Amino acid sequence: MRTYLDLLQHVLDHGVDRDDRTGTGTRSVFGYQMRFDLEEGFPVLTTKKLHLRSIIHELLWFLKGDTNIAYLKENGVTIWDEWADENGDLGPVYGYQWRSWPAPDGRHIDQIANLLKMLHTNPQSRSLIVSAWNPALVDEMALPPCHCLFQFYVANGRLSCQLYQRSADIFLGVPFNIASYALLTMMIAQVTGLKPGEFIHTLGDAHIYSNHFEQARLQLTRTPKKLPVMHINPDVKDLFAFRFEDFRLDGYEADPTIKAPIAV
């Protein structure tokens, strides 16, 4: 995906070197946007191989409303291990906010279920929004939500999604986020009778960690390949009924993985 490589190059060339929470140091820009037309192929990096299994299982885990890493561990996914406590708990992170946002009156709001209902009953609404940023609970989360708010838009029978990501780890995190929200858009489009439109990715603090510079420059020497095609089981009409086996990525050819340390 040339769009992603352009982001890497832009931050390396124009970013500002700054300190950060982890003590690693970053080079960052503030405010950047990428657009991906989902009819042109599934937006997964081809200039380094991604672990698709982790991306799919993490998304299914979010949609379950789960906040314990047991499900992830059972399925060979380790991307949340560094932040979990001794019991595997992460606090009220993404899944909890998506599916069980606590209201002042004691109710719990299922934002995803509400979104699906609105897409069926009022697809022209400008309130097709899900937020993971709950100021009252941020301090109880193992990690404040990086991809914190997303909005859907329906036009000409196509469903588009825009994600606002306050903190974007460009080398390790952003490729996962692109694929995850593109897949979520495709899944929701299927269960609401729409076609996938665009995924728009808006970044706040878009940064490359200083110990990822060498890896980023290596990736920039590689040439993007044709995007693969994601096939989703057409028989699934309930968003919460999807399983890992319902997804198949065809034609995914990618350069070797580039290893880089995680900043915790």
Curated annotation (Swiss-Prot):
Q: Which GO terms describe its biological process?
A: dTMP biosynthetic process; dTTP biosynthetic process; methylation
The UniProt entry, under InterPro entries, shows: Thymidate_synth/dCMP_Mease, Thymidate_synth/dCMP_Mease_dom, Thymidate_synth/dCMP_Mease_sf, Thymidylate_synthase, Thymidylate_synthase_AS
Q: Which GO terms describe its molecular function?
A: thymidylate synthase activity
Q: Which Pfam families match?
A: Thymidylat_synt
**Transmembrane feature ranges:** none
Q: Which reaction does it catalyse?
A: dUMP + (6R)-5,10-methylene-5,6,7,8-tetrahydrofolate = 7,8-dihydrofolate + dTMP
Q: Where in the cell is it found?
A: Cytoplasm
Entry EC no(s): 2.1.1.45
| Gene Ontology CC terms | cytosol
**Positions of dUMP binding:** R21, R166, S167, A168, D169, N177, H207, I208, Y209
Q: Write down what this protein is called.
A: Thymidylate synthase
Task: Name the gene behind this protein.
Answer: thyA
